[in-house]
Regions:
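Catalytic cores of soluble metabolic enzymes centered on carboxylation/carboxyl-transfer
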Residues: 1-139
Length: 139
């Protein structure tokens, strides 16, 4: 439960729907459930998705399918972000290391949909508009 558009800040809230990916050689380690509240105080990890296959290509295909099936409603997640990475040419070719996200963050975000059906800066825009309204009232 992180907001990838806001430097991966935690995205606390209540899980309204939890539908983990299923299938052969797909494992989800999680402690959450529908109506679980993700607190803002510590690591906002919801689940760990593990896939197993006989080779890298099959594992990536299985990962992509599992990410497409995995649905968490009510809070922002990094599922769409991870799906974008899993579909990238570099990841599919195995040219991927721990610096990949940092080096390619802008491109990844440009190709990632928002799982809360908002534009990336909707929250920020709302805050700015509210601040302007309050400022004008004080004058």
């Amino acid at each position: 439960a992180e907001n990838v558009w806001e430097n991966f800040i935690p995205a606390p809230g209540t899980i309204e729907g939890y539908y983990p990916a299923l299938g052969p050689s797909v494992r989800v380690d999680s402690h959450v459930y529908k109506d679980y509240t993700i607190p803002p105080f510590y690591d906002s990890l919801i689940a760990k998705l593990i896939v197993k296959a006989t080779d890298y290509d099959l594992a990536v295909n299985k990962l992509e399918r599992a990410l497409e099936e995995f649905t968490i409603e009510g809070v922002r997640t990094i599922i769409p972000f991870l799906l974008t990475i899993s579909k990238s040419k570099e990841f599919r070719r195995g040219f991927f290391d721990t610096s990949y996200v940092e080096k390619n963050l802008k491109t990844i975000l440009e190709n990632t949909y928002d799982d809360m059906n908002k534009e990336p800066n909707d929250d920020l825009e709302e805050v700015i508009v509210e601040a302007i309204k309050r400022y004008k009232k004080k004058r």
